[in-house]
């Protein structure tokens, strides 16, 4: 996976959080508050686990994408950037 798509999606999420456009799923979940977004991360985590154990590869990929998206929204609300995560992963690699 290219970092660029993650970085691009994160920028879109930041824009949606700032502007809160009508019809935006990101704006909708952010308007419900950080606890709601955190619960969505938990829900998507469980769905990813279930897909890995009982479903096909395409379903697993879809659930992982949902999990990553919701993690990015939660990261944005916490002020954590993808670059912060890349640095931490790099640090752990050493």
From Swiss-Prot:
The enzyme's main class, written as a single word, is: hydrolase
Reactions the enzyme catalyzes: 1-(5-phospho-beta-D-ribosyl)-ATP + H2O = 1-(5-phospho-beta-D-ribosyl)-5'-AMP + diphosphate + H(+)
Task: Output one GO MF annotation.
Answer: ATP binding
Record-linked CDD domains: NTP-PPase_HisIE_like (cd11534)
Enzyme Commission designation = 3.6.1.31
Keywords of the record? Amino-acid biosynthesis, ATP-binding, Cytoplasm, Histidine biosynthesis, Hydrolase, Nucleotide-binding
Please give a single GO biological process term from the UniProt record. Answer: L-histidine biosynthetic process
Q: Domain of life, per the record?
A: Archaea
One annotated Gene Ontology cellular component of this protein: cytoplasm
**Where is this protein primarily located?**
cytoplasm
Q: Which InterPro entries match?
A: HisE (IPR008179), PRib-ATP_PPHydrolase-like (IPR021130)
Which pathway does it operate in?
Answer: Amino-acid biosynthesis; L-histidine biosynthesis; L-histidine from 5-phospho-alpha-D-ribose 1-diphosphate: step 2/9
Family label: Belongs to the PRA-PH family.
Its name, as the record gives it, is Phosphoribosyl-ATP pyrophosphatase
